């Protein structure tokens, strides 16, 4: 019984001290706050009471600061750089995001251009050589299949090929299509190349 009384006494002291602490942070509202006006309004529903505040909202001050900042930036002189830009180009550049096309025009380097074109040409030549080798190997494979079907008449191989073609038509993911194409291209090149 005595433990219960002590516990109740401790609880009341704790709650009083917490209430005092919370009262420091409590603020009083002049008008009651209702949840209904805070909810999102649908369509043309207008609030019942429109309160006009005598003070300006903070948003109008922030908008003013933002517009003056843009005005200052447009009037400011730009730094000198290795490329020349007209004033209208500079204002367009400042007001619109930098697209890759404009970045390429503005920041092209004469040193890297020939090197990049040479590497691009060598990569394209290598790709066309590999593509031609794969196409030749695939043509040899097709000729082999035609020879197999016509002369030997093996129906089991024909059914396997039809199943393979059916699975190929049902592939949807570009990653798998690329993987299967590369695998069969290399297989055809290894087995049926003319070398």
Curated annotation (Swiss-Prot):
GO terms for biological process: negative regulation of DNA-templated transcription. Transmembrane segments: none annotated. It is found in: Nucleus. The keyword Lipid biosynthesis does not apply. Keywords: Nucleus, Repressor, Transcription, Transcription regulation. GO terms for cellular component: nucleus. It comes from the Eukaryota. InterPro entries: OFP17, Ovate_C. Residues 130-190 form the OVATE domain. Its main location: nucleus. Plants over-expressing OFP17 have no visible phenotype. Transcriptional repressor that may regulate multiple aspects of plant growth and development through the regulation of BEL1-LIKE (BLH) and KNOX TALE (KNAT) homeodomain transcription factors. This is Transcription repressor OFP17. It comes from Arabidopsis thaliana (Mouse-ear cress). The gene is OFP17.
């Amino acid at each position: 019984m005595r433990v219960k009384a002590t516990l109740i006494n401790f609880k009341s002291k704790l709650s009083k001290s917490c209430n005092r602490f919370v009262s420091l942070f409590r603020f009083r509202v002049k008008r009651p706050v209702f949840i209904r006006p805070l909810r999102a309004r649908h369509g043309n529903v207008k609030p019942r009471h429109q309160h006009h505040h005598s003070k300006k909202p903070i948003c109008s001050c922030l908008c003013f600061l933002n517009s003056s900042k843009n005005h200052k930036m447009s009037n400011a002189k730009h730094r000198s750089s290795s490329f020349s830009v007209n004033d209208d180009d500079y204002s367009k550049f400042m007001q619109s995001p930098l697209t890759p096309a404009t970045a390429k025009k503005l920041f092209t380097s004469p040193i890297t251009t020939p090197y990049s074109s040479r590497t691009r040409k060598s990569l394209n030549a290598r790709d066309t050589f590999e593509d031609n080798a794969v196409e030749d190997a695939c043509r040899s494979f097709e000729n082999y299949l035609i020879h197999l079907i016509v002369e030997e008449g093996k129906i089991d191989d024909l059914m396997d090929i039809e199943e393979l073609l059916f699975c190929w038509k049902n592939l949807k993911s570009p990653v798998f299509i690329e993987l299967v194409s590369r695998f069969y291209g290399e297989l055809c090149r290894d087995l049926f190349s003319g070398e």
